[in-house]
């Protein structure tokens, strides 16, 4: 059985599009970046930590379990934008992203007890239009930025702010479907 180690409703929705039966494992994994840790290493480590934590929860009941872990972070330069802690934090993130191109890093990892992990790192580039303070305040007030890396949901109201996207739309949402499908096939789970 395939298990998704994520609380994200977006990842659940995206994984359903691949027509693979799965169950969701609810867990909390610390997402703390070390001072000297690169953004790409960080996002891959967190995805692997989630997958291993999920496997630890289900392996006794399902020795053949395959667990998918994923993490998405928004990166501008060397600054990693996680999920905003409050509306003011969301506003600060959106101001920083306004009129600029940033990267969205999404790591996907598959683990099981019988083989080495398989993983992919998908890097997309997103360019925001210039946003004025009124646009930023209105978007932050709608609540959508909360719980989203970089304080925006590309599939929601923020889509109108995106001038250009290069890479994986589903990866920016939280689970790059092409790469996930390829990993599942290689792992024998698709």
Swiss-Prot record:
Transmembrane regions: none
Enzyme class (EC, first level): hydrolase
GO cellular component: cytoplasm
GO terms of molecular function: dTTP diphosphatase activity; UTP diphosphatase activity
Residues in coiled coil: none
Subcellular location, record wording: Cytoplasm
EC code(s) of this entry: 3.6.1.9
Record site feature (Important for substrate specificity), residues: 10, 72, 155
A biological process term (GO) from this entry: nucleotide metabolic process
Keyword Cytoplasm: yes
Similarity-based family: Belongs to the Maf family. YhdE subfamily.
Record function comment: Nucleoside triphosphate pyrophosphatase that hydrolyzes dTTP and UTP. May have a dual role in cell division arrest and in preventing the incorporation of modified nucleotides into cellular nucleic acids.
Protein name in UniProt: dTTP/UTP pyrophosphatase
């Amino acid at each position: 059985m395939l298990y998704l180690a994520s609380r994200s409703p977006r990842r659940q929705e995206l994984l359903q599009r691949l027509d693979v039966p799965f169950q969701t494992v609810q867990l909390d994994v610390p997402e703390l970046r070390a001072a000297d840790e690169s953004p790409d290493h960080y996002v891959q480590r967190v995805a692997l930590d989630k997958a291993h934590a999920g496997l630890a929860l289900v392996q006794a009941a399902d020795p053949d379990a395959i667990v998918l872990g994923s993490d998405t972070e928004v990166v501008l330069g060397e600054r990693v934008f996680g999920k905003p802690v409050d509306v003011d934090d969301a506003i600060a993130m959106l101001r920083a992203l306004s009129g600029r191109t940033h990267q969205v890093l999404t790591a996907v990892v598959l683990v099981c007890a019988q083989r080495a992990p398989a993983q992919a790192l998908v890097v997309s580039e997103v360019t925001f239009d210039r946003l004025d303070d009124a646009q930023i305040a209105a978007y932050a007030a709608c609540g959508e930025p909360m719980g989203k890396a970089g304080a925006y949901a590309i599939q929601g109201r923020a889509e109108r702010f995106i001038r250009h996207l290069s890479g994986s739309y589903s990866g920016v949402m939280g689970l790059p479907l092409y790469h996930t499908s390829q990993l599942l096939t290689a792992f024998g789970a698709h």
